[in-house]
Amino acid sequence: MAIRKYKPTTPGRRGSSVADFAEITRSTPEKSLLTPLPKKGGRNAHGRITARHQGGGHKRQYRIIDFKRVDKDGVPAKVAHIEYDPNRTARIALLHFLDGEKRYILAPKDLKQGDIVESGPGADIKPGNNLPLRNIPVGMTIHNVELRPGGGAKLARSAGTGIQLLGREGAYATLRMPSGEIRRVDVRCRASIGEIGNADQSNINWGKAGRMRWKGKRPTVRGVAMNPVDHPHGGGEGKTSGGRHPVNPQGKPEGRTRRKGQPSDRLIVRRRYATRKRG
């Protein structure tokens, strides 16, 4: 993938860029692997906003991705197409299996149209193949990693991400996450070889607010710029600091987003913030 820069013909075009989509081989998705994706606008069942800055955007259909691949062990598949997916930053690959079934997987770097991929403990070590962690050589870069055996891939699924397999000891494999966190995972968990493609996605300059609206992202407004009815930091004469510690619109302390005491916390060897420099 490469980045194509626009000429500065308008203020919105100045400095903006777009992916060149050179790796895309088909523009229309496989109909049998589509499902409706109704828009929620960030609202829950009561109509209250639970996810801010969401709404609008171009209409989409969800592409059904195979994140397990366990039921196709030993069945080779040919990469028919590399396609664009509006629901994720990674590209997706359409596989035609030898038994006639079609499925989507996340497209790793260097996977091309016409390649043969397979899954199972005896699969070759090449991009796109899916194996248990106990069968993958130490030092290999992997993606699409499960947290629990048979639970489906949860880690390293976005564009340009990859996890390094540092070692194995007993029933666990040690992995280095893209964030720098080091954690242990059951060796029965499965992973795909290689890193996710489309790594230049993070270098795209969107250029104008309108392009973000096409993606379904709404503006981020500061609480101190609102009225008291809309936010605990709102109101006051002139500009204010908010008058209290930062809170969200519901009045809960801002910044704490992760639940303490996750069952998998005991498997974390080193947290990601341990590598940061403290100033």
Curated annotation (Swiss-Prot):
Its Gene Ontology molecular function terms?
A: rRNA binding; structural constituent of ribosome; transferase activity
> What are the Basic residues biased-composition ranges?
40-58, 269-279
GO BP terms: cytoplasmic translation
Region called Disordered, residue ranges: 32-58, 223-279
What family does the database annotate?
A: Belongs to the universal ribosomal protein uL2 family.
What is its biological role?
One of the primary rRNA binding proteins. Required for association of the 30S and 50S subunits to form the 70S ribosome, for tRNA binding and peptide bond formation. It has been suggested to have peptidyltransferase activity; this is somewhat controversial. Makes several contacts with the 16S rRNA in the 70S ribosome.
Q: What is this protein called?
A: Large ribosomal subunit protein uL2
Q: Which gene encodes it?
A: rplB
